[in-house]
């Protein structure tokens, strides 16, 4: 099953697809998109269960990759350059393994093609606290999350996922329960299918200087 993906596009040139990270949305990479629009036709895509895209159950890496492939079909993109951050990097790698001809080149930011241990318990607790409180302001949500998350930058990132409802209270734009159910599958390593052709296109991995998501053991 696939869902409709929301996207925005701008610029001119070869097609470049940007895929965001867990709990994010396409406009998280807005600065990157604007910087590259003078050289590329940049498409910022919301992954399933994120942003303004549709919600679904069973959104593992192969399913997310297939949703992106179908989005490409809908927009007439036979192939494109890809830049994926975190979860978006995993989805891009999965697409490269499943449908290598659809990628002209691949840039993966701050994630490796491996399975990761669970590391978001505090974040899920903070998100649950905000969801249960029906906060009337972003400041209230920020204060609630600060009781569980020490990093202010993480709190500010998550606040971007809030949307105000008709009753004035804030709720998460992303599918919190769906992401929770699929969390183990999203932590898995991208994997190709038996007999599938390997992806042999240009690939660049970018490691954050203070991040531990790409370690020396992944080099």
Regions of interest found by a model, annotated:
Residues 5-54:
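Conserved HGGG/HGGXW glycine-rich cap/lid loop of the alpha/beta-hydrolase fold
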Residues 28-30, 53-59, 117-120, 216-217:
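Conserved catalytic-core motifs of eukaryotic protein kinase domains, centered on the activation segment
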Residues 63-80:
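Conserved acidic catalytic loop of the alpha/beta-hydrolase fold
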Residues 93-98, 103-136, 215:
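Flexible "cap/lid" loop of the alpha/beta hydrolase fold
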Residues 118, 133-187:
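Conserved alpha/beta-hydrolase catalytic His-Asp/Glu region
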Residues 167-219:
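Conserved serine/cysteine hydrolase catalytic core
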């Amino acid at each position: 099953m696939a869902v409709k993906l929301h996207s925005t596009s701008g610029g001119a040139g070869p097609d470049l697809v940007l895929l965001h990270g867990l709990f994010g949305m396409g406009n998280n990479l807005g600065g990157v998109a604007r910087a590259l629009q003078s050289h590329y036709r940049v498409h910022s895509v919301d992954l399933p269960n994120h942003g303004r895209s549709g919600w679904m159950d069973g959104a593992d890496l192969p399913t997310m990759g297939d949703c992106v492939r179908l989005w490409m079909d809908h927009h007439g993109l036979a192939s494109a350059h890809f830049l994926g951050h975190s979860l978006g990097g995993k989805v891009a790698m999965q697409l490269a393994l499943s449908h290598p001809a659809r990628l002209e080149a691949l840039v993966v930011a701050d994630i490796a093609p491996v399975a990761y241990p669970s590391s978001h318990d505090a974040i899920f607790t903070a998100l649950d606290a905000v969801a249960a409180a029906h906060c009337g302001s972003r400041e209230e949500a920020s204060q609630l999350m600060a009781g569980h998350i020490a990093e202010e930058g993480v709190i500010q990132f998550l606040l971007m996922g809030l949307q105000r409802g008709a009753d004035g209270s804030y709720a998460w734009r992303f599918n919190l329960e769906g992401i929770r159910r699929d969390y183990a599958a999203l932590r898995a390593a991208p994997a190709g299918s038996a007999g599938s052709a390997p992806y042999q296109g240009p690939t660049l991995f970018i490691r954050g200087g203070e991040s531990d998501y790409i370690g020396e053991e992944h080099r």
